[in-house]
């Protein structure tokens, strides 16, 4: 196993050499105020059988998880995804259906996962099951340090799992945007058997003091990044104006600072985008959102629908939808002069709810994860991307842009009193309670039977009337022919 631990201090964070003491077999960290990324890489021979048996039949597997809590991002960890569990799977052969992976995901994360598709999303507020799985499969019962280390995942802001058939290695990464309490304090020791490699990086901003540091010298290496953070005042807020009903409108509100062009090269073309992750019970109308009607687009401050994937059936109720939901990439319209625009710029996206199973109250609570909002800018010609070791890839949305595109992330800012990047909606459904008023299930069932019965009687009566009229007509004509024959005789 290989471990890579990276601490990144903010420019305003204090640092003294006594906070990092290196010896021949350990590195001691004391009260270090920094963001942290920890990455562990495993070979096949270090994994439990149920994991490597699934991986050996896979071509690629990428799992992304983000907390529902608001958290900060900073260079070089500057990318975001919507809260929840995201899975992107490429089987090794065309015959592989992903059944084994789905069973493994249920064991590792949650038994309630419905992961029939190769691309999947689920709201997963906690990684408690993952922690228990790691403690059971990777830690000895007497190894308290390993157990405690696994528990630290519960406070992580994001977790990534990656595998590809070329490297035959499973990589697990965790990110903590802030340090706990008074800072990171721990002793990172060398492995006793000297079989595990540990790399530790301490990154920060320091003022140059030595003469050789003051003199400018050309660098021999660089790390161009695709993801960049914007200033702290570049924020956005998500809401669903009441009443939501069955056709809620997702509103993204942004201050003027979010509408200013990001610090991209002058010749770059930039556009503001949002990427929505919608569970199966809520969806957009791709025919409505892909319209070129300028009046509709301008009324919602939208520019265009750029991509959609997943379930887009407009009529199916939720209980017959087999796929997890859908993803939507939309370009947002921005004012020509942001500094003279309204204090708050709102972009609205009309959505629709599917029929959910009945409940006793007549409502069901459902959660919508916040979308991410970002600027996408084309990079300069000749800029090589993808060499930054801290850049996250396979996020689900960055692959929809060209390889030379740079992203500038806006910061989600929940309203006062909210502490989650999730919106809860009360979805109206059929009531099951017998005292729920006139429109209750039994009344509707009885009314349906009565209406269908009356309709059937009306149809039978009409058919009988037609047959009676036809029979009467034939009898009359026959009688007339008989009378004519008698007169002729």
Swiss-Prot record:
SMART domains to which the protein is assigned, alphabetical: PIG-X
Ranges per topology, Lumenal: 1-448
InterPro entries: Pbn1 (IPR042322), PIG-X/PBN1 (IPR013233)
Subcellular location: Endoplasmic reticulum membrane
Pathway of action: Glycolipid biosynthesis; glycosylphosphatidylinositol-anchor biosynthesis
Record has Membrane as a keyword: yes
Keywords per UniProt: Endoplasmic reticulum, Glycoprotein, GPI-anchor biosynthesis, Membrane, Transmembrane, Transmembrane helix
Keyword Transmembrane helix found: yes
One GO cellular component term: endoplasmic reticulum membrane
Carbohydrate attachment residues: 346
Transmembrane segments: 449-469
GO BP terms: GPI anchor biosynthetic process
Cytoplasmic side: 470-489
Annotated membrane topology: Single-pass type III membrane protein
Family per record: Belongs to the PIGX family.
Task performed by this protein: Required for proper folding and/or the stability of a subset of proteins in the endoplasmic reticulum. Component of glycosylphosphatidylinositol-mannosyltransferase 1 which transfers the first of the 4 mannoses in the GPI-anchor precursors during GPI-anchor biosynthesis. Probably acts by stabilizing the mannosyltransferase gpi14.
PANTHER family hit by this protein: PROTEIN PBN1 (PTHR28533:SF1)
Name used for this protein in its record: Protein pbn1
Source organism per UniProt: Aspergillus fumigatus (strain ATCC MYA-4609 / CBS 101355 / FGSC A1100 / Af293) (Neosartorya fumigata)
Gene: pbn1
